[in-house]
Amino acid sequence: MSVQGPQRRLLGSVNSTSPAAPRLGLAANQTGPRCLEVSVPDGLFLSLGLVSVVENVLVVAAIAKNRNLHSPMYYFICCLAVSDLLVSVSSVLETAVMLLLEAGTLAGRAAVVQQLDDIIDVLVCGAMVSSLCFLGAIAVDRYISIFYALRYHSIVTLPRAWRAISAIWVASVLSSTLFIAYYDHTAVLLCLVSFFVAMLVLMAVLYVHMLARACQHARGIARLHKRQRPVHQGLGLKGAATLTILLGIFFLCWGPFFLHLSLMVLCPRHPICGCVFKNFNLFLTLIICNSIVDPLIYAFRSQELRKTLREVLLCSW
């Protein structure tokens, strides 16, 4: 990543005599002796990345194989899996190259490694932006399917879905390129943080509204069966728990990374903020964990997809 010094891992590996120069002027000793730094072993990071790669490859393969899954909703889920796959592959590739450089197995000039690092950074940033976009697209798709059920297939058509998907990928590539090129501009960081907040608010509003509609529907059914309280309370608790898990995981996995970006704008030289900066690799690990959890939340809950997944695993193409 290109947002702050210690995470420029490839360049730091080439010049082992001196650590990579921190970006935005953060001093190496600025964080003080009392900072809590959570170290993520490279083996654990690689293992999580590989698990994410396998999961998301299976999701893409299952959707590609089953024509019944060739619908806008599953195309959004497939693109989310591709985004998570790119995040994991890029992170694993960067870590693997860094380990090979440190071990002396791989030799490279600083200029070459700089170019490789920039390419990986663009992939990671673009995949992160597209992942957030497709999470929002899935929320919008589900919202339309509930509140405009009779008109859903006329609103969410395949051409419109493909246009939305194309726009998301183009915007992700352009924004990630600009982010890497102008990483030291405050406006770029503020745009990324604002984008995350917008996606969080969008998902929260849509899913809360969907939960309210589900509870309202349950109350109507309960009145007909004269079992209002048990049915309504049971569905309300289940829906609230699902909503809490969905938004909680999203915020837990993505929030620390964007907190890091926010603090880079607000207090890049403050010792307390420096303590947060030292845990950047932990924040990347949480994003990898999100790439592992996404298929469980959005893909594997589908019975049709699970059935196809079993066929894929049994190689019955």
Curated annotation (Swiss-Prot):
GO molecular function: melanocyte-stimulating hormone receptor activity
Glycosylation site list: N15, N29
Lipidation (S-palmitoyl cysteine): C315
Gene3D superfamilies xref list: Rhodopsin 7-helix transmembrane proteins
Claim: Ribonucleoprotein is one of the keywords in the record: no
Regions crossing the membrane: 38-63, 73-93, 119-140, 164-183, 192-211, 241-266, 280-300
Subcellular location(s) of the protein: Cell membrane
Xref: SMART domains: 7TM_GPCR_Srsx (SM01381)
Topology, Extracellular side: 1-37, 94-118, 184-191, 267-279
Superkingdom field: Eukaryota
Effect of P22L: In strain: Isolate Hya36
Cytoplasmic side: 64-72, 141-163, 212-240, 301-317
Membrane topology, from the record: Multi-pass membrane protein
Principal cellular location given in the protein's record: membrane
Keywords: Cell membrane, G-protein coupled receptor, Glycoprotein, Lipoprotein, Membrane, Palmitate, Receptor, Transducer, Transmembrane, Transmembrane helix
One cellular component (GO) term of this entry: plasma membrane
Its biological purpose: Receptor for MSH (alpha, beta and gamma) and ACTH. The activity of this receptor is mediated by G proteins which activate adenylate cyclase. Mediates melanogenesis, the production of eumelanin (black/brown) and phaeomelanin (red/yellow), via regulation of cAMP signaling in melanocytes.
Self-association and partners: Interacts with MGRN1, but does not undergo MGRN1-mediated ubiquitination; this interaction competes with GNAS-binding and thus inhibits agonist-induced cAMP production. Interacts with OPN3; the interaction results in a decrease in MC1R-mediated cAMP signaling and ultimately a decrease in melanin production in melanocytes.
Family statement drawn from the similarity comment of this UniProt entry: Belongs to the G-protein coupled receptor 1 family.
Protein known as: Melanocyte-stimulating hormone receptor
